[in-house]
Amino acid sequence: MKTVAFTTLGCRVNQYDTDAMKGLFLQNNYEAVDFDEKADIYVINTCSVTNMGEKKSRQLIRKAKRQNEDAYVIVTGCYAQLDPDAIAAIDGVNLVIGTNNRSKIVELVEQLESTERQINAVRDIMKESNFEEMPLFGNESDKARAFMKIQEGCNNYCSFCIIPYTRGKLKSRKIEDIVEEAKRLVDHGFHEIVLTGIHLGNYGVELPGRPTLANVVKALLEIPELYRIRFGSIESVEVSDELVELMATDKRVCPNLHLPLQAGSDHVLTLMRRHYTLQEYKELIAKLRSRIKDLSITTDIIAGFPQETDEDFEETLNTVREIGFTHIHAFPYSIREGTPAATMPNQVPEAVKKTRVALLNGLSQAGYEAYAKSRIGKPGEILIEKEENGYYMGLTNEYVNGKVKSDGAHNIGDLIGGIVVGLEDNYLIIE
């Protein structure tokens, strides 16, 4: 049996794409092995959000060839879509696929085997208008949570972001296809589904009848054995009243939202071409917290955007302190050629970016601890993801790490709960 190994850089959408490609190989009688092992085929799913993502992608390509010089090396994902010629020029790369056409990956490998010539299968993503169905079969992972992509592409064109150029226009998945995959995942033991997409909050705007993310959630709530529905990243301006009502009234819709802030300064938000003001963002947070009990809010913040002054950044720090995020994904601004921000004057020095990220990370940890401690004395429940050192471990509904003493009677994917009695090493202790 031929072996195939996968590695993934970047976001949850990329992880879904990897799992889906893995499923296609498994359906065709390949065996999946760890990327550090010798394999017949290596698949590297790349990222282009930052320069570091591209650097890591190149390193992984070379690592694969060192592990087995006779292996086929397949490079896919955003970096492959953005610069296929650069990928193809790397010694040892056999197949380049972008962010579309991946449903044919096994066929392309078979074509490789018959021709022994490099294949560049990257297509113009801007000409693609339909969602590429590449569903999970349920045997790609042994985890309790499954990521499920329901939307692709983005029309926002923020000044710093390369993703619209690598993922293309908005493309949404039909609700019936989403439900069919969700049922299959539940049948395979996945009791939490994380809905993901590049521009998740804009789900359905281009489909007939304009179905919404709330419509998707309502359809999924009809699946009895689906214990939890969680969302990936959603733009704050796209959180609808209908979605808020679902979160407020059905406990299976997790009280956790990832709402990218990107900057806590209106000056910087304008430069970024974001579609909200700081005041609008704060008002939404207040509204959400008034409606959704125990809501935890996580976010993304870019440090050191061009022209971000010390005063701008101090305003961001004050905003973070005021809102109290449960977690902040803080990262330094990275120049992406072809985006408006790349040519803006007054680029911030790397050392300043690093310092600002460190300050944000400190506030992130403080915010996590504050929220976690607020749970002490209240009910807590985890979906078991692993058993380790005598404890069942997993995430609570609110996206906080939790652990319960093992009794030997539960399995991965089960819900188990009690009362939160403490916090230890970033884990809630539940008894």
Q: What are these regions, as identified by a protein language model?
A:
Residues 141-144, 154-156, 253, 263, ...:
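Short flexible coil/turn linkers enriched for glycine and charged/polar residues
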Residues 73-74, 82, 87, 187-310, ...:
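Conserved SAM/AdoMet-binding glycine-rich loop
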Residues 255, 336-342, 430:
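Conserved loop-to-beta-strand segment in the C-terminal subdomain of adenylate-forming
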Residues 343-431:
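Terminal RNA-binding accessory module
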Residues 8, 233, 261-263, 384-386, ...:
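Flexible glycine-/small-residue-rich
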Residues 1-203, 218, 257, 279-290, ...:
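Proteins enriched for Cys/Gly/acidic motifs involved in redox and nucleic-acid/cofactor modification
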